[in-house]
């Protein structure tokens, strides 16, 4: 190839470029944001070096990674971010611990869930609201896990 591309870039349709470790531990043991960012940048660069020029993120804080790649700050593939999953109470994406209050009930907290991984939504209206808010924040696709 003489240092030139041999084929068009690959597309990976299911990646988590900015999520590390078992998801059940992230709400309690998240990496420091600087370390987390450095690992995400390294992972994105590795994807690009492996020939993936476009990836579809299916959950995790990849929108921030996408922004710095798009701005030319770091090398990486084109990212189509999902960011938050939409899940139901006690569904596959509900990572609350036993004593954590429900985030949609008075006194509950959104903290980790709304910012990084999961939006808990029950019923049609809550799912529509969650999807509209996610797309309004720059998501390009949405993952629903029940």
What is each PLM-predicted segment?
Residues 4-71, 90-96:
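Metal-associated gating/positioning segment near the N- to mid-region
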Residues 1, 50, 58-59, 82-83, ...:
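Active-site-proximal beta-strand/loop segments in catalytic clefts of secreted hydrolases
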Residues 3-4, 128:
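Short hydrophobic "helix-edge" motifs at membrane interfaces and signal-peptide entry regions
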Residues 73-146:
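Metal-coordinating catalytic core of metallo-dependent amide/deamination hydrolases
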């Amino acid at each position: 190839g003489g240092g030139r591309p041999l084929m068009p870039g690959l597309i990976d349709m299911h990646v988590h470029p900015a999520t590390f470790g078992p998801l059940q531990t992230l709400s309690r043991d998240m990496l420091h944001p600087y370390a987390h960012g450095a690992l995400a940048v390294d992972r994105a660069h590795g994807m690009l070096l492996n020939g993936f020029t476009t990836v579809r993120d299916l959950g995790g804080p990849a929108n921030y990674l996408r922004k710095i790649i798009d701005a030319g700050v770091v090398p990486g593939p084109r990212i189509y971010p999902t960011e938050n999953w939409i899940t139901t109470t006690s569904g596959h994406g509900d990572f609350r611990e036993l004593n954590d209050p429900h985030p949609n009930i008075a006194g509950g907290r959104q903290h980790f869930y709304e910012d990084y991984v999961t939006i808990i939504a029950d019923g049609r209206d809550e799912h529509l609201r969650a999807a509209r808010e996610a797309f309004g924040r720059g998501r390009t696709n949405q993952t629903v896990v029940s």
